[in-house]
Amino acid sequence: MLKRRSNALITLSRTKLFPITTVAYYHRRLLNQQRRAVSTSPKKEIKSLEDLANLDSLDGVDTELIRDLINEHTTKLNIKKELDMLKKFSQEEESGHEIPVKRFIRPLWMFILMGSSVYLLLHFSWWKLEHEERESQLKKEVEILEHQLNELIIQDKTHNTSRGKGSNESTHMKPWYRRWFW
């Protein structure tokens, strides 16, 4: 059995009868296959996976080279994904530090509406109390004025009755314009 590591061939034999002849046979056979594969394959240098994709077959290509190219490409992709993830985390962190205004618009409107409704309610109750107080003051003034008017009417009646007995009733019957001019 042959194993390939980097650029050296390591031979292992599991048969104990003819170990030397089997090793030599396998060694020569593999070397011949490699020479044919190298001579028939195009002499391009394979540097990337795209170069491998352009080949017709992978018969003469070293498996370690393919493995290294695949690992290199996966490493590049992993690094790219990690960078994208780090950018995403940094953007989330920056956006986490900034407090969005949208977060406060609804509570601000709620506060304004609640505050204005409380203000209107208190203003209405204050206006109602002032109105009732003013109404009670005006009622008292009306009562005082009615009382004064009643007193004056009573005084006038008593004054007219005492004066009315001695004066002419005919003068009261004349119209006012005749009393002035005749």
UniProtKB/Swiss-Prot annotation:
Record keywords, A-Z: Chaperone, Coiled coil, Membrane, Mitochondrion, Mitochondrion inner membrane, Transit peptide, Transmembrane, Transmembrane helix
Q: What's the protein's topology in the membrane? A: Single-pass membrane protein
* Mitochondrial intermembrane domain ranges by topology: 128-182
Which residue pairs form cystines in this protein?
none
Location, primary (coarse class) = mitochondrion
Q: What is this protein's function per UniProt? A: Component of the INA complex (INAC) that promotes the biogenesis of mitochondrial F(1)F(0)-ATP synthase. INAC facilitates the assembly of the peripheral stalk and promotes the assembly of the catalytic F(1)-domain with the membrane-embedded F(0)-domain.
Q: What is this protein called?
A: Inner membrane assembly complex subunit 17
Originating gene: INA17
